[in-house]
Amino acid sequence: PLVNKAVAWLEDNWSEEHQCWPIISEKANDNPRAPWWNWDEKTVSKGVFNPAADLCAALRDFGIDSELIDKSTSRQIDELRSGAEIEDHDLICLVRQVEGNAIEDQALVDLIRQAIRSKVSKTPDDLTNYGLRPRFVISGPTSVLYSDNRAEVDMELAFLAETQCDDGSWAPNWSWFGQFDEAWPKAEK
């Protein structure tokens, strides 16, 4: 029932004009949030890769058959072929499409691999800032991306072991940059 409701929501919220799902709802502006979750008219068309690529892969994993999966995947492939900028969060979502073999064009897979290689955090100093951490794009040693990024995975695992708090958590390496100061301390925990 939960998956069926999610699929119904996706079908109801598909933007035929932009060939994607919204990355965020307009209602998000009613609540405390990080600045990157501010909704405006431009955010409607930003969901081509994020969250769409991840959604398509998840729907395939659940055996859902929907023409929107094919439409969305086709749009993603078109965007990749056009040379569209691939941001860090886009890469996180595209990895599931690559690992699920939804992107069959090896040149596009190589493009995604190269983008990950160029953007993934490579030093412990990189990990103290907001960025593309190896574990965000590499699920484990069987990942098709693991061999390209093994040193970075090992470096991040060592960093995580060194920076874990006494209670077993890790402090965020980002903030809301002064937006909703009254709500940030609760969100930070």
Model region roles, listed by residue range:
Residues 1-189:
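Preference for long, amphipathic alpha-helical scaffolds in soluble/luminal domains
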